[in-house]
Amino acid sequence: DTRGAEEFAGRDVRASRGGHIPGSIHVEWVNNVDEDGRFLPASDLKELYASAYITDELGDIYTLCQTAVRATHSWYVLADLLGFDNVSVYDGSWTEWGNREDTPIDS
């Protein structure tokens, strides 16, 4: 989940329900770049994701945010800069998940 911490926790609600998908891991997309907006070196990015237990051995990885824009940024980091083979963007992202009544949510 690449959204901000308040969105992930369910305090910044941008759909009919707030929170996050159960079992999701939060790594905010802005952590991929330095203060000038440039991508961090690959070694730093690898360390960032490894510290959140996100490795290429994890299995299928789906990035999401509110509308898949920030998620695509993190997808690029994982798939292109770090070379993960198992990454996809959840296109519906939180707009879809958070507005459905039949999806589980943690906060």
Segments from the language model and where they lie:
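Rhodanese-like catalytic fold shared by cysteine-dependent sulfurtransferases
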Residues: 2-107
